[in-house]
Structure formats: C-alpha cells, structure tokens
C-alpha cells in the first residue's frame, strides 16, 4: 500500500491540524458551559421536586421549605447583608426581584420563601445589614401578598357571576 501526497493534500492536512488546535479551546469551553447548564438544570429539577413535595404534604413540610429557602437566604445575605440606611424601593426592589427570579418565578413560591427567610433572620438582627434586609423583604411582601391574593381570587372565583353591578 503506497500513499502519495501532493502539495495540496499536505496543505489541507496542515490546515486541518491547525483547525483542530484552534478548535480545542472552543470545544473545552463549550464542554464547560454544557456541564454548567446540566448542573443548573439538575438544580432546577431538584428544586421543582422539592416544591412538589412541599405542596403534596399536608400540612406543608417546613423542613422542605427550609431546604428551599437556604440558598435564597445565602444569596440575599451576600447581596444585601452589608447595606445600611433606608431602603430605596426604586433601586433595591428590582435587585431583590432579580435575585429571587434566579430561584423561582412564581409569586406564591416567592411569598413562601421570603416569609421563611424573614423568619430566619428576625432572631439574628444583631448583624449590620439584617435590619436593612428585613425592611426590604417587608416592602416586597407588601406588594407580593396583595398581588398573589388578587391572582388567587381571579383563578378561584372567575367562574362566578358578579350580581352586584
């Protein structure tokens, strides 16, 4: 078996090896991104299973809620734990909502998590930023609780005709 190489095949062979060497960093970066996505999807699936377990238990299991609230509490303490002074709702509430959006997008879940986080930080208000975080969570709950009540009312009572008007 003889192999004949001409100038064109050597050039194409060299360019393909160069292409492989330039593609290897991109492939490893893509692999890293894929692994990160799989881990985050796994975390999302785990959170979803925990939420289903929480809602399926009667009465709701507070140990499961504590497991769900722990990463949110840590993220909120990392983000707002050192703040002092008054809460500026126009700036602080969107930041709080963006942190909460990373964990859960449903209002009822956010409500449960925020109440659990608030319960967990109330006894330990000796730290610097905890009164600030507590006030920020209270301001968000003042918006979230009525909003969730309105949505719940619309979902459960929309089939009934309003005879008063």
From Swiss-Prot:
Keywords: Plasmid, Secreted, Virulence. GO terms for cellular component: extracellular region; type III protein secretion system complex. It is found in: Secreted. It comes from the Bacteria. Residues 2-11 are annotated as: 5' secretion signal. Induction: At 37 degrees Celsius in the absence of calcium. Pfam families: T3SS_needle_reg. One of its GO terms (biological process) is protein secretion by the type III secretion system. Disruption phenotype: Mutant displays reduced virulence in a mouse model system. It displays a reduced ability to inject effectors into macrophages and requires lower calcium concentrations to activate type III secretion than wild-type yersiniae. Mutants secrete YscF into the extracellular medium but do not assemble needle complexes on the bacterial surface. Disruption mutant still requires Ca(2+) for growth and can secrete the Yop proteins, with the exception of YopR. Mutation does not abolish type III targeting or secretion. Changing residue 146 to I: Not secreted in the presence of calcium or when yersiniae infected HeLa tissue culture cells. Coiled coil: none annotated. Residues 131-149 are annotated as: 3' secretion signal. May be involved in the regulation of the assembly of the type III secretion system (T3SS), also called injectisome, which is used to inject bacterial effector proteins into eukaryotic host cells. May control the secretion and/or polymerization of YscF/SctF, the principal component of the needle filament, thereby impacting the assembly of the T3SS. Involved in pathogenesis. Essential for the establishment of Yersinia infections in a mouse model system. Fusion of YopR, an early secretion substrate, to the N-terminus of dihydrofolate reductase (DHFR), GST or other tightly folded proteins generates impassable hybrids that cannot travel the type III pathway and block the secretion machine. This blockade may be caused by binding of YopR hybrids to YscN/SctN, the ATPase that is involved in substrate recognition and in generating energy for type III secretion reactions. When expressed during type III machine assembly, YopR-DHFR blocks all secretion. NCBIfam families: type_III_yopR. Belongs to the YopR family. This is Type 3 secretion system regulator YopR. It comes from Yersinia enterocolitica. The lineage of its organism: Bacteria, Pseudomonadati, Pseudomonadota, Gammaproteobacteria, Enterobacterales. The gene is yscH.
């Amino acid at each position: 078996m003889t192999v004949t190489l001409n100038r064109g095949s050597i050039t194409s062979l060299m360019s393909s090896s160069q292409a492989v060497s330039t593609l290897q960093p991109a492939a490893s970066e893509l692999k890293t991104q894929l692994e990160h996505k799989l881990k985050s999807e796994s975390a999302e699936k785990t959170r979803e299973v925990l939420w289903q377990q929480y809602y399926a238990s009667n009465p709701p299991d507070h140990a499961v809620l504590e497991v769900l609230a722990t990463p949110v509490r840590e993220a909120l303490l990392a983000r707002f734990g050192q703040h002092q002074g008054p809460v500026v709702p126009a700036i602080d509430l969107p930041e709080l909502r963006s942190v909460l959006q990373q964990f859960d997008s449903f209002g009822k879940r956010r409500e449960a998590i925020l109440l659990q986080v608030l319960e967990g930080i109330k006894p330990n208000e000796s730290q610097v930023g905890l009164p600030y975080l507590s006030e920020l969570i209270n301001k968000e709950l003042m918006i979230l609780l009525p909003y969730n009540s309105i949505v719940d009312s619309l979902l459960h009572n929309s089939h009934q005709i309003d005879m008063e008007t």
